[in-house]
Amino acid sequence: MLKSIPYQFGFTALFVAAVIAVPSVAVAQDASEVTFAKDIAPILQRSCQDCHRAGSIAPMSLLTYEEARPWARSIKDKVVTRSMPPWYIDKNIGIQGFKYDYSLTDDEIAMVATWVDNGAPRGNPADMPSPREFRDIAEWKIGEPDWVVEIPEPFVVSEEAPNWWGDLYSDSGLTEDRWVKAVETKPSLEGFPVVHHAVTSMEDLESEDGDYNFLNEYALGKNGDIFPDGTGREIKAGGQIKFNMHYAAIGVETTDRTRVGLQFYPKGVVPERKLISAHVGDDEDLDIPAGESNVRHDGFYRLKENAQITAFQAHLHNLGKRQCLGAVLPDNSKQILSCADWDFGWHIVYNYEDDVAPLLPKGTTLHVTSWHDNSDANRWNDDPTNWAGFGQRSSDEMSFAWVSWYDLDDESFEKAVEEREMAADNNN
């Protein structure tokens, strides 16, 4: 079983990781001084209001004191249990440097709890930060794309339709090869509630074997992908976009027109690295007995080249509980890179900061460990008396991780390791 141990410098994989113990919580000011205007509103603006505002996906708005105050006890409960905001990385093990990290610190959690326990005071209105400006919910998270392709026809999901899975194809319309630097797959506003997932890829029609290049996945809680600087994905002229769709009825006839938006590098610019994204550690031989709360499965994926891992995303279904991504190095030493609890409502990509992203030598085996909870303690479990196994429906189960990386030749890998070692020495 993988254990959390420091990386060995040199031949082994390397990251400057924070394998941190949770610090003792100390709130800087007196409890009576914690107010909404001065202390809580800035936290809500940074970590909550993208969803908790009118027209977005959350059930209530938290833009103002008047909106937030009736929900104070609920806010405390969700924050203290770390179920909100939805950021489920285990902060006590593995890498802790992530881009786009909107989670709360221990001190911020303590501050929210103190504010609620003290009666949730407003404070001085003059202390309120300026209101945030938000892009329209219909706008693209990656910014305005250079190219947009829709599914070929509007797709109608009747009010009581069974789950539907299938591939839809649209001509890309591209007349020249281009390198992509950002991509977002996006259901239509009306269709959003019925789209469980949408996976887009590029099919090269000139390839006899059918060459597919993954573009992006949409699922609840997962937005577009902005690739790390100097990386990209090439798409060929004359190909087709494949939309792998999963639709689920919601009791009302609903029409969807999912689309994918692409941002390109300037013509003639070729990024230094090709970014690869794949699901790894797939286990289709799942055996999850009824009533069992901690069922483990393991999957593996061998890296053929030196690699820098840029992102990790767990993928489970309703019974999912937790997943860890580990690495078994060529010298047989083992590392845990990241662990994340699982909530089926949120498919979150954890993007590593560049200076801590795992550097792994060729021959490393990625080890994906997943746990499922088929007991009545799992709020997502409709029937804890039922055995569960692998399948495509939400009521079936899955076990794999989405992982993104780019390959490095030996010279580039050794240079990256050396730079990481020097940075570590300078920090000591």
Q: What residues fall within each predicted segment?
A:
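N-terminal secretory signal peptides that target proteins for export/translocation
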Residues: M1-Q8
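Bacterial N-terminal signal peptides
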Residues: G10-P23
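Basic/polar N-terminal segments that are highly enriched at the extreme N-terminus
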Residues: P23-A31, E418-N428
